[in-house]
Amino acid sequence: MRAFYGTELPNPLMLGTAQYPSPAILEQAFRASGAGVATVSLRRESGAGQTFWSMIRDLGVLILPNTAGCHTVKEAVTTAHMAREVFGTPWIKLELIGHTDSLQPDVFGLIEAARILTEDGFQVFPYTTDDLIVGERLLAAGCEVLMPWGAPIGSGRGLNNEYALRAMRAEFPDTPLVVDAGIGLPSHAARALELGYDAVLLNTAVARAGDPVEMARAMALAIQAGQLAHRADPIEARDMASASTPVIGKAFLS
């Protein structure tokens, strides 16, 4: 796995901390998933106080604060600075939403905010689209990680555009890439790892499942399977059949 700003992730799964039925289920799901990174919202921390923060710390995972809910560059930058003070980390998942219904990122504002935050000493994890040019601009702005969406946030649709995600992996072979948003099933997570992505970030698929803890276990196993499959160098798909049984020595009857 590629390093994220010099840090090796203990696990390719990044898991969000919102929407769980209870703090106890959140904790159980995290432990079942083996997730190495927890994404947290400054708004959640402000509302729940030290109890929530203490529980997350006790999980022993890396913390990735986010700027969820921000719609302007100024708002995102301000939220990032506040998060750094609260959580004590230069990591920031930069979310800058441009469309209310689809929650599609505002890529123009995203690039500007990424540049400002990088200059301010942040290590930026930008939630972006699968557009190659946007990816190039984000790297030029100082980002060392890209987080393209699989599908709109919370949609559970999986990987809407595998072609674009494969192209991004090929275009940025040395850059850590994370599929962020849209994962709904373990098979979606496995597929992202099969494509060579370094990690997946998900929240709703686990938190809103009928049994979040069981879904967390399923995600952990799927991610492991996808990672192993990618390492194994799988065969390429073909349009025509290819016999797996040799015909040498086969008897011919007249």
From Swiss-Prot:
Q: How does it assemble?
A: Homotetramer. Forms heterodimers with either ThiH or ThiS.
Report the subcellular localization: Cytoplasm
Q: InterPro entries annotated for this entry?
A: Aldolase_TIM (IPR013785), Thiazole_synthase_ThiG (IPR033983), ThiG (IPR008867)
Q: In which pathway does it act?
A: Cofactor biosynthesis; thiamine diphosphate biosynthesis
Q: Which domain of life is it from?
A: Bacteria
Name of the gene: thiG
List the keywords (alphabetical): Cytoplasm, Schiff base, Thiamine biosynthesis, Transferase
Its annotated function is as follows: Catalyzes the rearrangement of 1-deoxy-D-xylulose 5-phosphate (DXP) to produce the thiazole phosphate moiety of thiamine. Sulfur is provided by the thiocarboxylate moiety of the carrier protein ThiS. In vitro, sulfur can be provided by H(2)S.
Origin species: Ruegeria pomeroyi (strain ATCC 700808 / DSM 15171 / DSS-3) (Silicibacter pomeroyi)
Q: Which family does the record claim for this protein?
A: Belongs to the ThiG family.
Q: What is this protein called?
A: Thiazole synthase
Chief place of localization: cytoplasm
